[in-house]
């Protein structure tokens, strides 16, 4: 029975004059004679006890295991089939150090020497995330000669059990998916285990009753090799797609990297702190860049050329491992030696003019807060050549206006570039124009 007690005196043929409690194996069903109703009653669940030295030491009751190597060496083909049926996935009902009990019917006891294996296995998985007190994973490939394209969930609260199927809401779970291609990443987003391929995402709706459901959304997914770019910043999920960086809020992903131009990046690794998304990527020339996206302002900044192996947020800072030095770097400088003033540059968009006449600039009025120095450059009519236009120097770190006169030059449009070293915050730019003729 379920406690491991042996059923005694089980008849192989129907007794002619049974007493109450008499047992009889009718084919594959164990029956008990009910003296009150004078009829045979099927025993709903029959158990088999397997005894072997230390067989139960490594397991717990409720574990899902796979049995193999069980065989009956007698002459009865019926009993051989009963023993062979035990070679399957089972749930341990009871256990001791030297025995386990599983669901199964054998009509005769037998002993064998060697060959028996009991395994508790986790499936091979490409990516894993945690959600709703379970681990969830995915796998695309070939297993035992068969194509595999599946998602998995472990038993509730038990990461060791992935094949425990007892008909309960806490059981392990697995499902096949129909989308093509390899998995490229996984993340817990808004409580949903979310799995990505390059052109689709699959989201699992976790059910308290165990009836979990998979939905798929054809969209820009995670680029192959950029699974570490998945990161939540201000409740929005950011990641590196094949051609752009995407933001996903639970509906459909949108691109946020138009300002980075047509450069193709790969092997992205990212982390988040506050409202900022830090991402280290390899560009098309093979060099790495560390870029920062300010989600609140929609601005991109290039920090430096660091290659980050991975990011982790802790102690009110964001840390990453620098691949060049294998050192831990605090992005916000709360630990270690703070770096000195950094060089910076900012380039405006194309600034056109509202008047039909050819115009020329007489000066720029810049309102900024600065502690350091900056140089001003101008580019006329998208010529590709930057012309030096002046230098700013202000060490106090307060806000003030600077009038920057420029040599008059007629043009259709102009771009401005500021570069310098130290602290700088730009509030406004005013252009002072002089009008000329159409000639």
Regions found by a protein language model. Give the residues of each.
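Beta-propeller and closely related beta-pinwheel folds
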Residues: 121-272, 301-304
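Tryptophan-centered short beta-strand motifs
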Residues: 1, 38-40, 47, 211-216, ...
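Residue-level recognition of conserved beta-strand edge/terminus positions
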Residues: 27, 68-69, 138
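Extracellular/surface-exposed low-complexity repeats and stalk/linker segments enriched in Gly/Pro
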Residues: 2-30, 36-45, 260-268
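Short proline/glycine-enriched turn/loop motifs at strand-loop junctions of beta-rich domains
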Residues: 56-60, 198, 369-374
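Small/polar beta-strand repeat architecture
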Residues: 2-4, 22, 38-123
């Amino acid at each position: 029975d379920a406690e491991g007690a042996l059923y005694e005196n089980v008849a192989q043929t129907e007794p002619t004059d049974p007493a109450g409690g008499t047992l009889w194996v009718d084919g594959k069903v164990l029956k008990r004679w009910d003296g009150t109703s004078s009829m045979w009653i099927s025993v709903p669940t029959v158990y088999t006890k397997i005894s072997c030295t230390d067989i139960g030491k490594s397991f717990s009751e409720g574990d899902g295991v796979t049995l193999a190597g069980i065989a009956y060496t007698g002459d009865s083909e019926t009993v051989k089939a009963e023993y062979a049926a035990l070679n399957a996935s089972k749930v341990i009902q009871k256990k001791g150090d030297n025995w386990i009990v599983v669901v199964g019917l054998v009509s005769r006891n037998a002993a064998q020497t060697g060959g028996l294996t009991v395994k508790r296995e986790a499936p091979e998985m490409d990516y894993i995330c945690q959600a709703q007190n379970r681990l969830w994973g995915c796998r695309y490939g070939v297993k035992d000669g068969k194509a595999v394209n599946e998602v998995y969930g472990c038993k509730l609260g038990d990461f060791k059990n992935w094949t425990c199927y007892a008909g309960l809401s806490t059981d392990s779970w697995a499902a096949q998916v129909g989308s093509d291609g390899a998995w490229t990443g996984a993340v817990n987003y808004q409580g949903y285990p979310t799995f990505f391929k390059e052109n689709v995402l699959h989201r699992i709706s976790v059910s308290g009753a165990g009836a979990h459901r998979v939905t798929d959304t054809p969209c820009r997914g995670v680029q192959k090799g950029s699974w570490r770019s998945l990161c939540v910043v201000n409740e929005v999920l950011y990641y590196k797609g094949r051609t752009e960086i995407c933001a996903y809020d639970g509906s459909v992903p949108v691109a946020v990297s138009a300002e980075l131009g047509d450069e193709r990046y790969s092997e992205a690794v990212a982390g988040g702190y506050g409202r900022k998304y830090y991402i280290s990527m390899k560009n098309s020339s093979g060099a790495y860049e560390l870029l920062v996206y300010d989600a609140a302002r929609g601005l991109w900044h290039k920090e430096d050329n660091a290659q980050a192996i991975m990011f982790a947020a802790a102690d009110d800072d964001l840390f990453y491992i620098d691949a060049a030095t294998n050192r831990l770097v605090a992005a916000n400088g709360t630990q270690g030696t703070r770096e000195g003033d950094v060089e910076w540059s900012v380039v405006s968009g194309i600034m056109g003019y509202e008047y039909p006449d050819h115009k020329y600039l007489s000066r720029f009025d810049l309102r900024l807060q600065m502690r350091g120095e900056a140089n001003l450059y101008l580019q006329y009519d998208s010529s590709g050549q930057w012309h030096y236009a002046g230098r700013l120097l202000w060490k106090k770190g307060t806000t003030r206006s600077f009038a920057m006169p420029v040599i008059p030059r007629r043009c259709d449009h102009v771009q401005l570039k500021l570069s310098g070293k130290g602290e700088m915050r730009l509030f406004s730019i005013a252009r002072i124009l002089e009008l000329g003729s159409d000639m």
